[in-house]
């Protein structure tokens, strides 16, 4: 009995210990604070576009678009072609310039019906005397970031043949057409005044006209050839055929140093031309005769005719290193011998090849009341009378 009781007590004790072990709370470890997770995003920058390569002469091609007509034997009886200028590359500049060239080509194509009409109306061109409607292109400048092209258009359909010239000029940095006044290192007033003087001289030399209209002194277009401004004209403007006239303005500034200009002035006798606008819309061509000696003396005569001057003057001159020509003169009126006066004239000298331009630098002490920026075009006598 006692043994059974001991076993029962032992069993109860074991059960009690087991129950305690199940109800004792588990020891919990404090949580270690976790650092907030950070997401790092790598920023990948877009690669910068490569700068556009400058357009050079090697990037410019002339592609002849030929649709000449042939007879049954394969001989050409009507020359019909156009020289299309193409700038290579995918740049915006190339695209803009090519669009302008394409527009000029499409203008040529718009006249194709006229060619077909002449050929269908019984006109009989032959291989020995073919008709022609052609446009030839010459790339005349790619320097100083300026692209210039001279076009020569020829037309003959059995009657009178015509030749016309025109130019297209572009800024190679922007692809935009370049105005004549913006292409040269001179003020727009000086450029336009020099153009008038050049054309006035040309008209006088070819037509012996003292006066001309303002309208004739405006070129229809221009190009740059041998770094020089060239004025372009259609047929029947300054003659039956069109023409090109070089104007002594060049790209890039002075072509000669002051020392070279002094030598140039001293070795020639000069005849100069400039224009005076009249109230009636006409432009009178004025003439100046000039000579410069090595001893610093000079002589000047000016009026409307190179054979009959109104005023003559003698004195001294200086040409500074910054190309300013100063003339101190005693001037007499040819027709009023008692009329004389002293005058000081100053000009900025801009020299081209054989010609020079004398530019009025201020409105003070000006020759014949010329305004600032107006010009006198001077040419060696030997050149003028050759």
Task: Enumerate the predicted regions with their spans.
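Generic short beta-strand segments
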Residues: 150-156, 234-236, 276-279, 295-304, ...
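Tryptophan-anchored aromatic micro-motifs
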Residues: 265-286, 315-317
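Beta-sheet ligand-binding and adhesion/scaffold domains
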Residues: 324-386
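N-terminal glycine/threonine-rich, aromatic-flanked beta-hairpin/loop signature
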Residues: 283-326
């Amino acid at each position: 009995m006692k043994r059974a009781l001991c076993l029962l007590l032992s069993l109860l004790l074991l059960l009690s210990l087991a129950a305690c072990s199940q109800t004792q709370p588990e020891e919990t470890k404090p949580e270690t604070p976790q650092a907030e997770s950070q997401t790092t995003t790598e920023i990948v920058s877009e690669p910068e576009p490569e700068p556009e390569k400058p357009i050079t002469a090697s990037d410019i091609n002339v592609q002849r678009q030929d649709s000449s007509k042939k007879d049954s034997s394969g001989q050409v009886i009507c020359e019909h072609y156009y020289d299309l200028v193409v700038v290579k590359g995918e740049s915006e500049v190339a695209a803009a310039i090519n669009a302008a060239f394409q527009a000029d080509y499409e203008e040529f194509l718009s006249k194709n019906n006229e060619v077909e009409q002449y050929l269908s109306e019984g006109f009989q061109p032959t291989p020995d005397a073919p008709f022609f409607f052609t446009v030839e292109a010459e790339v005349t400048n790619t320097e100083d970031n300026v692209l210039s092209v001279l076009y020569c258009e020829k037309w003959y359909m059995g009657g009178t043949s015509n030749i016309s010239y025109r130019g297209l000029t572009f800024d190679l940095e922007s692809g935009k057409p370049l105005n004549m006044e913006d292409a040269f290192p001179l003020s727009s007033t000086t450029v336009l005044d020099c153009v008038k003087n050049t054309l006035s001289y040309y008209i006088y030399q070819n037509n012996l006209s003292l006066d001309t209209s303002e309208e004739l002194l405006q070129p229809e277009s221009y190009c740059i050839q041998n770094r020089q401004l060239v004025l372009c004209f259609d047929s029947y403007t300054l003659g039956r055929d069109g023409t090109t006239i070089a104007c002594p303005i060049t790209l890039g500034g002075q072509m000669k140093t002051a020392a070279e200009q002094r030598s140039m002035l001293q070795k020639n006798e000069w005849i100069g031309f400039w224009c005076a606008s009249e109230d009636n819309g006409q432009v009178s061509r004025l003439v100046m005769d000039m000579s410069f000696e090595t001893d610093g003396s000079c002589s000047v005569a000016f009026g409307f005719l190179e054979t009959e001057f109104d005023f003559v003057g003698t004195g001294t001159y200086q040409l500074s290193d910054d190309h300013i020509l100063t003339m101190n003169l005693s001037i007499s009126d040819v027709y009023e011998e008692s009329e004389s006066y002293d005058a000081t004239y100053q000009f900025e000298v801009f020299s081209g090849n054989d010609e020079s331009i004398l530019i009025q630098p201020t409105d003070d002490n000006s020759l014949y009341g010329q305004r600032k920026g107006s010009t006198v075009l001077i040419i060696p006598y030997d050149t003028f009378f050759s």
